[in-house]
Curated annotation (Swiss-Prot):
Keyword annotations of the record: DNA recombination, DNA-binding, Transcription, Transcription regulation, Translation regulation
Protein's GO biological process: DNA recombination; regulation of DNA-templated transcription; regulation of translation
CDD domains recorded: IHF_B
Keyword DNA-binding listed: yes
Transcription regulation found in the keyword field: yes
Protein name, per record: Integration host factor subunit beta
Family: Belongs to the bacterial histone-like protein family.
Alphabetized GO MF terms: DNA binding; structural constituent of chromatin
General function of this protein: This protein is one of the two subunits of integration host factor, a specific DNA-binding protein that functions in genetic recombination as well as in transcriptional and translational control.
Top-rank taxon, per record: Bacteria
Alphabetical list of HAMAP family matching this protein: IHF_beta
Any single GO CC term annotated in Swiss-Prot or TrEMBL for this entry: cytosol
Lineage summary: Bacteria, Pseudomonadati, Pseudomonadota, Gammaproteobacteria, Pseudomonadales
Subunit-structure text: Heterodimer of an alpha and a beta chain.
Length: 98
């Protein structure tokens, strides 16, 4: 699902809100979450999951075109850990689908 599909879905279910209002809300939530992660904060949404930063150590990689070794620097990457309710909901719906 893309951001625009999410906006359309929410707007269709919340008829009192315009598409523009929903779009602004979704955009604002994403911006605030991104900024919180950039500031090194952990985000926890109970029943959904948590977002945190994980450290990736420097390593030697390979250029896929040339095969040459390339040094990749250490970095922090966003990590999502689904909450128990989300895991159970996804697992239950996948069991029904198979």
């Amino acid at each position: 699902m893309t951001k625009s599909e999410l906006v359309e879905l929410i707007a269709s279910k919340q008829t009192q809100l315009s598409v523009k209002d929903v779009e602004l809300a979704v955009k604002s939530i994403i911006e605030h979450m991104s900024q919180s992660l950039a500031d090194g904060q952990r985000i926890e949404i109970r029943g959904f999951g948590s977002f945190s930063l994980h450290h990736r150590a420097a390593r030697t990689g390979r250029n896929p075109k040339t095969g040459d070794a390339v040094q990749l620097p250490a970095k922090f990457v966003p990590h999502f850990k689904p909450g128990k309710e989300l895991r159970e909901q996804v697992n239950d719906s996948m069991k029904k689908g198979f």
